[in-house]
Amino acid sequence: MPRLSPFHSRTYALCRSYAWKEWAGYLAVSNYDRHSEREYFAIRGSAALLDVSPLFKYEVRGEQAAEFLAKMWTRDITRLPVGRVVYGCMLDEDGYLLDDGTVARLDEQHFRVTSSEPWMAWYQAYSRGFNVQIEDSTHRIAALALQGPSSLDILNQVVDDDLSGLRFFGARPTTSEGRPVLVTRTGYTGDLGYELWTAKQGALPLWDALVAAGADYGLEPIGLDALDVARIEAGFVLQGVDYVSARSCLTESRKSTPFDAGLGWTVKLEREGFVGREALCKKEEEGGVWGLVGLELSWPAIEAIHEEYGLPPHLGPVACRTAVPVYDRYGLQVGQVTSSTWSPTLKRSIALAQVKREWAKIGTELRVEYTVEFERRELPATVVPRPFFDPPRKTDTFGEAS
């Protein structure tokens, strides 16, 4: 039986579609209406509210908390200032990806870690010899993502401090109606946005305050389907879709390094001491095989194929997670699309794909398998820069920086 989020009484009442998914053991809304179009446009045009409580959350405390996390994550957490958040990934001893997530430094000896999967046993196994205490706070802390162009205006009406100066990937403790709330300027939409973390006892008052403040701004509660489209536009990878955790892989060929999955920017191989470094260095010295790229599919070709069948192309903002082959111009398979969608904002058909690195250069012409009426066809596709959508407001500071 799935666990219910602290916000379930609110999300359940609003979910007219009765479309739900299981997310990390929780019941989560797929889309509130029968289609996610309105929710998607709230992300890009006004403001959106998403329950992200199912994220796994860990409190790491102690004199050696920073050193411990610097060992467990690819980022040098010892250099992370108080009030800042960093994105990174965890590797196994063989240098393969286990998970990605964030680490927030709340004070000198207190960090909050988020991830897609549970890692308590993994942390405990590596914590021997470190003066740290690790708490699984997943079920104790409720979390909301407030995303979109109007998110700051709504947020400032709900919290008791002006957060206009909160920088991208900043963290600030504040209060809402006297209840403690941690606000981080983070999110999974690639837009201006914030995430709010509070004790589960304060979950419903926080939701109600945000909904009331957002009424004049077109705030919409959103589900995971709309989020999926937004994160592809932002070029963000999803664990279990764009790469598979090494812990879950049944064959070696399914495992990925950070460089294979487009997360190489989170790794500095010259930094010693993190789990998997030596093996990862060796793999890169031997020559890595894969890379993650953005693809733009030819829209005229999509129209032409559908015209043959007397069908219109589908333009709804619905993401596809079905892996399909990618070929070079000679018909040799060089990779696979992992996520794809029609982007209503960009008016382009876009995809994330894992391809062999020699075909990962911007501008490379490839072909993607495309199925219409159960018949497999091929479409021209071009390797393009990632992210596809990257508005300045995502990182702009709107007040005195903090």
Where are these regions (language model features)?
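Conserved, structured C-terminal
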Residues: 1-16, 20-23, 28-31, 104-402
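Acidic active-site catalytic centers that drive phospho-/nucleotidyl reactions
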Residues: 51, 100, 195
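Acidic, proline/glycine-enriched N-terminal capping motif
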Residues: 1-91, 96, 225, 292
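Well-ordered mid-protein domain cores that form the structural environment of catalytic cofactors
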Residues: 71, 75-129
